[in-house]
């Protein structure tokens, strides 16, 4: 299997695309950290471990291994705990899929600073925080892969979604002993080894 022996963190894996990515990685042999705060699509309201537990149950029913983490990507200390969950449960981390996102449907002149910052904190800061927390492990083991998700709202815009355009189009570009290749609306890890002297 392509990902046999690998450990993957998938943020926003309690449902939708994130769940499908987590399931696909598990089917390919990876052990998966299912990260999801279990809130609404807007990121508001009560949080719950249930969505993540449902993804975990499907993976385990299919013979895979997974653990659930409910920390938020939008906070540095929280993001470090997400990576720590992988290391504590499976001994390492090989793949980070930055999929977590929230939605604020609002036309620009009605978007509040709080709405703007909420999206920036999840989409942009969250991608940086989780990637940065994993980067130290990637450097130490000399390998790793990032997958950064975006949407058509981030690439070409969408009426009523000004908060999504900027953070999605500003996904991190990384230069480390890991690789990430971005094209169209999905980013996928490359199979090439790190170039000598990559910083």
Language-model regions, residue ranges each:
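The beta1-alpha1 cofactor-binding region of Rossmann-like NAD(H)/NADP(H)-dependent oxidoreductases
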Residues: 49, 70-84, 113
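Canonical Rossmann dinucleotide-binding motif of NAD(H)/NADP(H)-dependent dehydrogenases/reductases
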Residues: 3-34
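A glycine-rich helix->loop->beta "capping" turn
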Residues: 62-65, 85-98, 104, 143
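Residue(s) in the substrate-gating loop at a strand-loop-helix junction
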Residues: 151
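A short, exposed helix-loop element centered on a Lys and neighboring polar residues
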Residues: 131-132, 176
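The catalytic Tyr-X3-Lys active-site helix of short-chain dehydrogenase/reductase
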Residues: 154-157, 162-170, 174
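Substrate-binding pocket helix/loop in short-chain dehydrogenase/reductase
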Residues: 59, 107-108, 115-120
């Amino acid at each position: 299997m392509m990902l046999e022996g690998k450990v993957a963190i998938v943020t926003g894996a309690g449902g939708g695309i994130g769940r499908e990515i987590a399931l696909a990685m598990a089917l390919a042999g990876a052990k998966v950290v299912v990260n999801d705060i279990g809130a609404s699509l807007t990121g508001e309201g009560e949080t719950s471990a249930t969505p993540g537990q449902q993804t975990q149950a499907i993976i385990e029913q299919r013979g895979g291994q997974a653990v659930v983490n409910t920390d938020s990507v939008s906070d540095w200390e929280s993001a470090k705990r997400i990576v720590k969950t992988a290391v504590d449960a499976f001994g390492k981390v090989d793949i980070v899929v930055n999929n977590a996102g929230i939605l604020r449907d609002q036309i620009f002149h009605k978007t509040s600073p709080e709405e703007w910052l909420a999206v920036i904190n999840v989409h942009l800061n969250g991608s940086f925080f989780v990637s940065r927390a994993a980067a130290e492990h990637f450097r130490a083991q000399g390998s790793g892969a990032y997958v950064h998700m975006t949407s058509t709202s981030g690439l070409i815009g969408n009426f009523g979604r000004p908060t999504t355009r900027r953070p999605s189009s500003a996904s991190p570009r990384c230069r480390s002993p890991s690789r990430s290749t971005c094209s169209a609306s999905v980013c996928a890890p490359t199979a090439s080894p790190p170039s000598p002297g990559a910083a």
